[in-house]
Amino acid sequence: MQKTTYYDNSSTLFGGYSSYQVQGAAAAAANGFGGYDAPVPVSHHQPAFQSATHLDVDSYQRSACSLQSLGSTNSHQQQQQLAKTKELNGSCMRSSLPPEHHPSSQVSPPLPPNPTNGNSGAQQPGGSAGTSSKSGSNKSSTSSSSISSSTSSSSSSLPPNPTLAKQIFPWMKECRQTTKQKTCSPSNNSGNGAESGSSGEKSPTGGSSASSKRARTAYTSAQLVELEKEFHFNRYLCRPRRVEMANLLNLSERQIKIWFQNRRMKYKKDQKSKGLSSSSGGPSPTGSPPLTMQSSASYLNSMHPMGGGGGYDVPSPPSFGKPHQGVSYAMSTAYSNVPVKGCPPQQKYGPPDPDYGDPHPHHSLVQANSAGYGTPTNMQGSPVYVGGGSYLEPMPGSGPSMYGLNHLGPTPTHHQTMDYNGAGPMSATNQHHVGGGGPPGPCDPPTHPTYTELSAHHTSSQGRIQEAPKLTHL
């Protein structure tokens, strides 16, 4: 590649509506690629000026858009015909340049390569038209090659002339933008022009993909009311209903799906905070024990698995108004093989009683008639199995509670009642055991197991579930 001299003729640059002229030798034209010189713009309204250039034959043979191989004359003739039919606009310029930058059909002819004619002054428009009619093929070949070489120079950004790097023409900027659009059109906002703009406006969810942060969707109050109503009836939305709501509320399916996801998370959070507050504030009014109690009961259940699958129903809460003097529990005579300390191994127990889980008061939570439910101390323990029946829930005001499983012998009695010995309000220091404490041994079948007061050494249990030995021995 050899350097060429370049003379800028600045008086002919008019606002970008210009065609570019490249002088090339006859050999370079036969080669299919004209010699590259700096383009000199020629306006529509002015006589065509030509830059006085002298150029060697074989300079800058490179094309970005043309698909011809070097030195093929057949493809060069095809390119001539293509350039003629497209009125010298250039097949590659049409795809890359906007229409206002396309060169017009009035192209000044190339000069013969001798330097004397190359140094001639201004050429008249009439003369330019005459010579353009004479040298049609030469002109078309050089114009198309000038277009291709100009695009190649801008895209490859390797100009042969150092002065060309300093001057940036509007077509260079435009072509750089178009190559940028081609390579990264999905991520470029200004890339596809109206297409990406309209798609950004059409899609209400995220705007165009060039914006890294999605715009926050603002729901109207009417939309929120409808969404909340739907969430109240159904927390999980099926697809047909989602499509219906999207059409109804003028939202996209994706927005409705994401709204429901967020609403479910909020609902879970609310439930969790409600559960924590109710567990700290006494028995929960909904009938299911608080979350901490449930987890403790399941922990106890895993330590001492009951027969019949280990699952249990949550008993209905006792009516707070009437205290039961003798709350009878359904103590089934059949237990699972819970290892009990000091008991003979012939105590084999079967599945629990069939009427377990009945929300009758004798299955309900244990109530002390004297310990009022308004006592300020919180319920610190957790519900436990008593026998094969339902929960034993700790008394409010009983402090850290201890539980023991009722040890029934292999007696065929179907139900046994537990009476409360009518002690006063249970103090926080005294512990109360379910089961046959007192004079009979732990394995003797107590016919009427009474609540017996224990010594104060059991008060160290911090409201948590007791270890297995403390649970079973009395």
UniProtKB/Swiss-Prot annotation:
Q: Does the keyword ATP-binding apply?
A: no
The record's region (Disordered) falls at 91-164, 176-215, 269-325, 341-362, 424-474
- Give the residue ranges of motif Antp-type hexapeptide: 168-173
A single GO BP: anterior/posterior pattern specification
Question: Which Gene Ontology molecular-function terms are recorded?
Answer: DNA-binding transcription factor activity, RNA polymerase II-specific; RNA polymerase II cis-regulatory region sequence-specific DNA binding
Q: What is its main location?
A: nucleus
User: What Gene Ontology cellular-component terms does the record carry?
Assistant: nucleus
Q: What InterPro entries does the record tag this protein with?
A: DUF4074 (IPR025281), HD (IPR001356), HD_metazoa (IPR020479), Homeobox_Antennapedia_CS (IPR001827), Homeobox_CS (IPR017970), Homeodomain-like_sf (IPR009057)
Which segments show compositional bias classed as Pro residues?
439-448
Q: Where is the composition biased (Low complexity)?
A: 130-157, 185-204, 274-292
Q: Which UniProt keywords apply?
A: Developmental protein, DNA-binding, Homeobox, Nucleus, Transcription, Transcription regulation
Asked whether the keyword Cell division is assigned, the reply is no
**Regions of compositional bias (Polar residues) in chain numbering:** 116-125, 205-215, 449-464
Tell me one Pfam family matched here.
DUF4074
**Family, per the entry?**
Belongs to the Antp homeobox family.
Q: What role is this protein assigned?
A: Sequence-specific transcription factor which is part of a developmental regulatory system that provides cells with specific positional identities on the anterior-posterior axis.
Its protein name is Homeobox protein Hox-B3a
Q: Which organism is it from?
A: Takifugu rubripes (Japanese pufferfish)
